[in-house]
Amino acid sequence: MPSEHPFSDGIPTPNPKETMNDTAQITASYGRRYIVRTPDGTTYEASTRKKRVDFACGDRVRISPVNAEQVVIEDFLPRQSLLYRQDAWKTKLIAANVTQLLIVTAAVPSPSVRLLQRALLAAEAAGIEAVIVLNKADLPETALWREKLKFYETLGYPVIETRALENAGSLRPALQGHSNILLGQSGMGKSTLTNALLGSQTARTGDISAALDSGKHTTTHARLYDLNGETQLIDSPGLQEFGLHHLQAADLPRYFPDFRHLVGQCRFHNCTHRAEPGCAFKAAAQTGAASPERLAFLQGITDELPG
């Protein structure tokens, strides 16, 4: 009897005569369907047992064989990092083992300050370095957005200007040596940047995953590419919201570069940074040492979190 396809609801039992119990890295994620690559470069279609969905692009995993082309993911290996978002209803894993988040923005379509700030918070919470990419920098509409991004440079986040179709190579020095992920709203040019950086590699990887992704040109699932032996790049789907329900309200100030030095300086240890006397955060906002808008953002996120 032919083996059951691993992308059906049932998971086939590996042939006990098979000896492979190897490791691999997830290079593409499609819900409960994955593409994994072993250290020798062999690529397999992969599924999970018991409908597990707690795997992410970039995960290093243990695999067991199904046949010459298909494997089952048994578990993930210890992660260096995990980037994800969570709202009141669900959790969405974005990528694992990334060391640098590149938030791709552009003046057109209208950029979201809300999304930018939330993504920066998520990176801080996950211990991931963050870089802001100002794409389509040659557009006349860019001037105002460029000015707004200067504030984030003062917080320590580099801003790199690119024109994806002309000088995507300006990103290479920042990418080198990192496991990178491009994240941002739809239409900001993430996939165009990826194609410019990867060239023919994109087409080869697309051949592998085309059957799973319905041949769409718009990125619908995260995909990992190698830039070189030391550098990886994940292109992720566009998003409009970034839920932060996985964060703890008490930890939030430490994720704000402009407020973390004030932690512990309020008169009351349980200060909410609103009406309490002796609040160091309010004092900083009132004197101009910190942005009132950023304090309002901190308060808003605190109100949003459960508990």
Curated annotation (Swiss-Prot):
Q: Which organism is it from?
A: Neisseria meningitidis serogroup B (strain ATCC BAA-335 / MC58)
Q: How does it assemble?
A: Monomer. Associates with 30S ribosomal subunit, binds 16S rRNA.
Q: Which keywords has UniProt assigned to this entry? A: Cytoplasm, GTP-binding, Hydrolase, Metal-binding, Nucleotide-binding, Ribosome biogenesis, RNA-binding, rRNA-binding, Zinc
Which EC class, in a word? Answer: hydrolase
Q: Transmembrane ranges?
A: none
E.C. number(s) listed in UniProt? 3.6.1.-
| GO terms of molecular function | GTP binding; GTPase activity; metal ion binding; rRNA binding
Which Pfam families does the entry mention? Answer: RsgA_GTPase
Localization (cell):
Cytoplasm
The record's function comment reads: One of several proteins that assist in the late maturation steps of the functional core of the 30S ribosomal subunit. Helps release RbfA from mature subunits. May play a role in the assembly of ribosomal proteins into the subunit. Circularly permuted GTPase that catalyzes slow GTP hydrolysis, GTPase activity is stimulated by the 30S ribosomal subunit.
Could you identify this protein by its name?
Answer: Small ribosomal subunit biogenesis GTPase RsgA
